[in-house]
Structures are given as structure tokens and as C-alpha cells.
């Protein structure tokens, strides 16, 4: 900043002043007049404050980042599934192991085991793989008959200050294979993906995706006019491809294992709820796999009955 300094000599005279009141005029004095030059933005030594639009755009960016699916936990579910050509008998009650997946994509040690005690029952329970006592983290109970959806029960001994909770896995409708779960953590839905979603998953996985199940968190938000709008956020996906499905199973196998990817960022600072969400995702994913096996067995039974009755 440059300044211009001038020296001025000033003499004051009083107009119409009474000489008796002011006997002597005031003395002459000198003053400096300083003219400030215009400050250019480039010459300022301080950083200017950010514009409002910059702050607003940054806020939008941070909000949209949470809507992008980013897996914070990956698990490999190993299950042989049910082949296309076989008798519609109940599968063997072999335990389903769920393994941790490292940051490099390598499979680590087992984290959970889903145990089905009896072959003629679909009910099962989930335990820690290293728990010799096999204390259930949650149990899934299947009931026979229409209008009786399976229930997942989160056991109260797993989490501090938490009562047991029963969660129904309800079908969304007759013409869809999607299911809905209403919990204290929110409302969640398992559904089968669209072709566009499979192509997007193929880009991230690096190979063709045979089957993709998506776990959505469903929320109701208020909009203008006093109405409510449904919003969805993907919190999980179950990917089955040539490299991720259980070894020995095929593309046409029903209920085979694959890679479960979970986005648990919303619950990172709430340890108990994060663990509850992880267990719920694993148990409900295994339930979706069983649903595929039941569907395959039903189709096989219908085919056998049609052939025995001499159908067209």
C-alpha cells in the first residue's frame, strides 16, 4: 500500500467575530494530509475468506460421499448351494462358514459359523467361529405355512444393555423376491439388482457378476406439501461371480456362497450397533441363500409332479 503525504499551511480567520471576545487570532499550524491508494487483491498480505458458494459446494461433496457405496467390511460366505439337476430333498445340515477378507482381497480366518442342527428344519443359529461353547449371537427360526415369515432373534447376551429383539423377514409381495426387515437400527430391504447395477458391480469387481443381491437402508423423509418421500441408501451387497462364488459351485447353483460387502460407516462410532448391523446382514444374507434353495426345490418338485401326471 502506497501513501501520499502533503504539508498544508492553514490560517483561520473568524468572520463577524467580536474583537473584544477574541483579542488575538489563533496561531498558524501545519497539518499533514494522507491520501491512501487503492488496494489491489494481489497486494493484500492476508488470505481472503472463502466464498459462500465454496463452503456450500464442499458441504454437498461431503454429504454425497456418504451416499456412495464404500465397503468397510468384507466377508466370504462359503456354501456349496443346491445344484440345478437333483432330487428336491432337504440339503445336508453342513455348517456355513463366514470368513474375513483382508484389504488385499485374501481370505483370512473364519469369523462366524451358521449352524443348522437338523436336516428337516431350516432353523439355524449364528456363532463365533472360535467359540467352543457355540453361544448364539442370533437365531433364525422358520415356521411352516403361509403368512409365517422367518424371524431373526438378536440375543440379549451379545450386546450390553440391549434386550432380545425379534425381526421378521417379510416378503415385499407376490411378484418379487425382495424382503423387508424393520429393526431398531432402521428399515432394511434385500433385493435382486438390475442389469445396470450388475454392470456397475462388474466394474468394481473386475469380472462379470452372475448374481447380485443388494441390501438397502430405507428411510422416509419429509418433502414439500407435508408429504413423505422414500429414500434408499445401499449398505451392503452380496456378489457372486466366477472368482467370488464358493469353489465347486456353478452359475446355475442356487443358494451358493459369495462375497458379502458391507458399508458400515454410519455405525463406526457406535460399536454395539455396528456389530448388530454386521450380524443382521450376515444372518439375513444366509436366509436369502436358503430362500433360493427352497425356490429351486419347489421348481424341481413341480417338474417331477408334472412329469408323473403326464403333462404337456
Regions found by a protein language model. Give the residues of each.
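Long, contiguous regulatory modules within eukaryotic nuclear regulatory proteins
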Residues: 170, 178-183
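One face of beta-strands
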Residues: 150-152, 165, 177-179, 211-213, ...
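Short strand-coil-strand connectors
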Residues: 155-157, 182-186
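Short N-terminal edge-element motif at the start of the domain
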Residues: 94-175
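Low-complexity or membrane-interfacial segments used for flexible interactions
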Residues: 2-107, 184-312
Amino acid at each position: 500500500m502506497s501513501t501520499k503525504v502533503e504539508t498544508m499551511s492553514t490560517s483561520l480567520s473568524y468572520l463577524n467575530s467580536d474583537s473584544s471576545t477574541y483579542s488575538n487570532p489563533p496561531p498558524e499550524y501545519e497539518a499533514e494530509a494522507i491520501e491512501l491508494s487503492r488496494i489491489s487483491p494481489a497486494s493484500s498480505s492476508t488470505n481472503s475468506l472463502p466464498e459462500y458458494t465454496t463452503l456450500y459446494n464442499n458441504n454437498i461433496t461431503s454429504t454425497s460421499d456418504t451416499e456412495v457405496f464404500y465397503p468397510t467390511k468384507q466377508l466370504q460366505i462359503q456354501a456349496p448351494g443346491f445344484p440345478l439337476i437333483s432330487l428336491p430333498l432337504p440339503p445336508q445340515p453342513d455348517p456355513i462358514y463366514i470368513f474375513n477378507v483382508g484389504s488385499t482381497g485374501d481370505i483370512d480366518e473364519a469369523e462366524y459359523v451358521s449352524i443348522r442342527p437338523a436336516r428337516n428344519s431350516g432353523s439355524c443359529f449364528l456363532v463365533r467361529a472360535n467359540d467352543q461353547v457355540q453361544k448364539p449371537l442370533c437365531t433364525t427360526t422358520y415356521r411352516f405355512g403361509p403368512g409365517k415369515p422367518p424371524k431373526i432373534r438378536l440375543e440379549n447376551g451379545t450386546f450390553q444393555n440391549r434386550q432380545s429383539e425379534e425381526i421378521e423377514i417379510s416378503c415385499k409381495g407376490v411378484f418379487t423376491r425382495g424382503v423387508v426387515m424393520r429393526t431398531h437400527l432402521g428399515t432394511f430391504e434385500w433385493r435382486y439388482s438390475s442389469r445396470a447395477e450388475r454392470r456397475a458391480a462388474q466394474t468394481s469387481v473386475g469380472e462379470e457378476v452372475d448374481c447380485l443381491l443388494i441390501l438397502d437402508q430405507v428411510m422416509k423423509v419429509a418433502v414439500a406439501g407435508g408429504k413423505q418421500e422414500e429414500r434408499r441408501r445401499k449398505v451392503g451387497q452380496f456378489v457372486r461371480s466366477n472368482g467370488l462364488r464358493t469353489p465347486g459351485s456353478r452359475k446355475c447353483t442356487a443358494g451358493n456362497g459369495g462375497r458379502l460387502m458391507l458399508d458400515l460407516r454410519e455405525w463406526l462410532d457406535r460399536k454395539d450397533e455396528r456389530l448388530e448391523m454386521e450380524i443382521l446382514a450376515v444372518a439375513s444374507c444366509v436366509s436369502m441363500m436358503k430362500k433360493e434353495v427352497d425356490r429351486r426345490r419347489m421348481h424341481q418338485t413341480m417338474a417331477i409332479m408334472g412329469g408323473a401326471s403326464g403333462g404337456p
